[in-house]
Each structure stands twice: as C-alpha cells, then as structure tokens.
Regions:
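Short intrinsically disordered, low-complexity coil segments enriched in acidic
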Residues: 1-2, 157
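Sequence-level detector for tyrosine residue identity
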Residues: 24-27, 96, 104, 112, ...
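Broad structural signal for hydrophobic residues in well-ordered alpha-helices, predominantly aliphatic
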Residues: 31, 92, 125, 151-154
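N-terminal [4Fe-4S]-dependent radical SAM core
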Residues: 2-63, 67-99
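Basic, amphipathic N-terminal segments that precede the first structured/catalytic domain
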Residues: 4-14, 127-134, 141-143
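Distinct, well-ordered alpha-helical segments
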Residues: 115-123, 144-154
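Structural recognition of alpha->loop->beta junctions
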Residues: 62, 122-131
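Core AdoMet radical
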Residues: 68-88, 92-115, 130-143, 157
Length: 157
C-alpha cells in the first residue's frame, strides 16, 4: 500500500526510545539524541514576580511555590543573565561534564512582564554559545497571546 512504512526488523522499535529500554519518550533522551550529549539546565533569576505575590491576584505567593526552597541564592541581588550563565555553566560543567545547556528562567513567573522586557532577556540567554534552548517557568494564566508570539519567535523548525 502506498505511503506505508517498511516493516520493522526483528528487535527494532518504531520509537527509538523503546530501543533504549525506556517506557516513554523522556526529555533527557530527546536532548541527547538531538545534541549528541548531555544537556543540563542552568537556573537563572531575571527578577520576575508573580500575580500571587505582587497583589494582582493575591499576596504572599502560592502554598506550593516557595522559590527560596529551590533557588535560595537567586533571590539575592542579581547578576546579569550573561554572568549568571557563565557562573552556572562553570559549576555544572565540572559536576555533570555537560557542554550544552538550557537557560532555565526558574523562580517566579517568567512570562509575567511586558514583551519589551522578555524578548531581550531571552535573546541574551540564547546568545551564549553553549546555550541550546530555553526553559521558562511560568503559570498558564500568565501566557497571553503576545507572550506566545514572542516564544514562537524563538522556536526552531
């Protein structure tokens, strides 16, 4: 029949992650396949807040999200994105022997700012020669259409 794939050889899987013994397509597996090596996240603090912190929705933050618990050093005076990346990469390279990194905008809601502020921050992170992508921590109610468009500008086809 036209358009059908050829039959698989014995022991061959339709999905390469199955051949690796995985039960699902893990993001780590995808990154290793795409870049040929380990890719590690570098946590960045761009100084964002959250509608549950600044009073727009509530005050005091969410009960499940205490940024101090997972990034205590990041809530101190901030370095530039470039300096945070350089510092984080230096630490992670020795710990994980990684050479490629995701810029992880971690604490708070990292789409909770005007597009004019977001774009240069994301561009600065992607300009680093060892950064291969972005990971952006946010809330689903803080990604309006204009933020979708900005994020779409950074996608790789």
């Amino acid at each position: 029949m036209a358009g059908q794939s050829p039959p698989l050889a014995p022991g061959e899987h339709k999905f390469p992650w199955r051949s690796a013994g995985l039960r699902y397509h893990a993001y780590n597996f995808f990154l290793r396949q795409k870049f040929g090596q380990r890719v590690q996240k570098v946590s960045l603090d761009a100084g964002f807040t959250c509608p549950n912190v600044d009073g727009t929705v509530a005050i005091g933050g969410c009960t499940f999200c205490d940024n101090r618990s997972f990034s205590p050093s990041r809530r101190t005076p901030r370095l530039s994105i470039q300096n945070q990346l350089d510092d984080g990469i230096r630490r992670l390279k020795t710990r994980y022997t990684a050479d490629r990194f995701l810029a992880y905008f971690q604490p708070a809601t990292n789409t909770y700012a005007p597009v004019e502020k977001l774009r240069p921050l994301y561009e600065a992170a992607l300009a680093h020669p060892q950064v291969v992508g972005l990971a952006i921590g946010t809330r689903p109610d803080c990604v309006p259409d204009d933020r979708h468009l900005v994020l779409g500008d950074f996608r790789e086809t």
